[in-house]
Regions:
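A detector for small-residue-rich transmembrane helices and their helix-helix packing motifs
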Residues: 1-199
């Protein structure tokens, strides 16, 4: 793997091990907590906009995010370069967090923390579809091959739909969309600046 993608993967695995077997209280400090006025619960802190992405809800959550990072991260890092890749990933993570905070503020309800690298991963998926639009990707179910641009488009639309319809879900669908939107905004900025030969 490329260096930044590898280090993100290692950090996420380390974060998962720490939160589950060494220091479960990390969730109180590092998970993304919504804005609320309940003194008995942890509250939002600025660093949580990034740190939540290194924690995960369970082993399957970690596995699928790290599998996607392994599949798409190195190709994007090779295209962007390591420094720009890191900036891009962090922007996607933060934009996903902001989308989640807005969604939680609008919907309300009992405050629950958000964890996971999915916002960053969805940003990488978007970048992959733009950089390699005609590469074939396979759906898990049903197992249908399709070009990357179509895979990304359908997946993004599905997440947007679920974000407004699956209100009771434990999956932060609009955070996924937020990661893609943040990634797209940064790519458009780079295109405008003409600093990225591939984008």
């Amino acid at each position: 793997m490329t260096p930044v993608a590898r280090n993100i993967l290692i950090a996420c695995i380390a974060g998962f091990l720490l939160q589950n077997w060494v220091a479960p209280e990390l969730v109180d400090t590092l998970a993304l907590w919504p804005l609320h006025d309940l003194p008995v619960l942890p509250s939002f802190q600025p660093w949580q906009l990034v740190t939540y992405a290194f924690l995960h809800g369970d082993l399957m959550h970690l596995f699928f995010n790290m599998f996607a990072l392994y599949m798409f991260g190195p190709s994007i890092e090779q295209v962007m370069g390591s420094r720009r890749f890191l900036v891009y990933y962090v922007v996607c993570v933060v934009s996903a967090a902001l989308a989640q905070l807005v969604m939680q503020a609008v919907i309300g309800g009992f405050p629950r923390p958000t964890v996971g690298a999915s916002g960053g991963v969805f940003g990488l998926l978007l970048a992959y579809g733009l950089a390699f639009p005609h590469r074939r990707l396979m759906l898990i179910f049903p197992p249908i091959p399709m070009p990357a641009w179509l895979f990304v488009t359908l997946y993004g639309l599905l997440e947007l739909y679920l974000g407004f319809t699956a209100r009771g879900s434990n999956v932060a669908h609009l955070a996924h969309v937020g990661g893609m939107v943040g990634g797209m905004a940064l790519i458009l900025y780079w295109r405008f600046q003409r600093r990225s030969p591939r984008y």
